[in-house]
Amino acid sequence: MTFNKDKYSNDLKLKFLSYAPITDASWKLVEDIIEFQLLKKGEILLRNGQIAREIHFICKGALRAYITDKEGNIYNKNIFLEGYFAGSKVSLLQQTPSDFTIEALEDCILIAINYKKYRELINQNDDLKNYYIAYLEKNWVIEKEQREIALVMENATERYLDLLAKHPDISHRIPLLHIASHLGITPTQLSRIRKSLDKNS
């Protein structure tokens, strides 16, 4: 697969800059520790029980993180699309085995960031540290709390509409069974919600 590395590197840079100002010198240091990675649909990025070494920026494609219980039942933990980072944060931070698997739902172009080297850069560069703090606050605190509250306070239709507002084309790209699992409902429930919305539109 041929692709424009400069474009996707710039997409990653813009992602960083959306959280905090970063100098060109610091960005060059980041560029030195990234690698492009191609993943085919159905391939595994991170397996349950594997220790994560990298965090991945999604340039193109979609992935899901899923948990398998003792009975073999699978539950989607998250769905990741373009412009998002995918990885096991707990595994990266604690260097412990991941509790979930990350699988490609589409052919993907990813940028892999070596987390150990990335942490070294954070410790040496205040602008990268400011970005890291801002990213953690938004994604690991604010959005996590908002999603937990939504699971309790919002009904399934509201959660589905929120998902469509963030990702309008998701229902055309991701199998509905994965979307349903992500929302904490059954595929049958999601089908009813979609039919009801179609009738009212």
Where are these regions (language model features)?
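Cyclic nucleotide-binding regulatory module and flanking cytosolic helices
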Residues: 1-35
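DNA major-groove recognition helix of helix-turn-helix
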Residues: 190, 194-197
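Short N-terminal helix-initiation segments at or just after the protein's N-terminus
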Residues: 1-8, 43-55, 109, 178-186
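Short, Lys/Arg-enriched C-terminal cap helix and immediately downstream tail that follows
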Residues: 160, 200-201
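Hydrophobic residues at beta-strand termini and immediately following loops
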Residues: 37-39, 80
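Polybasic "coupling" helices that flank or enter modular domains
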Residues: 103-187
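Cyclic nucleotide-binding regulatory domains
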Residues: 44-104
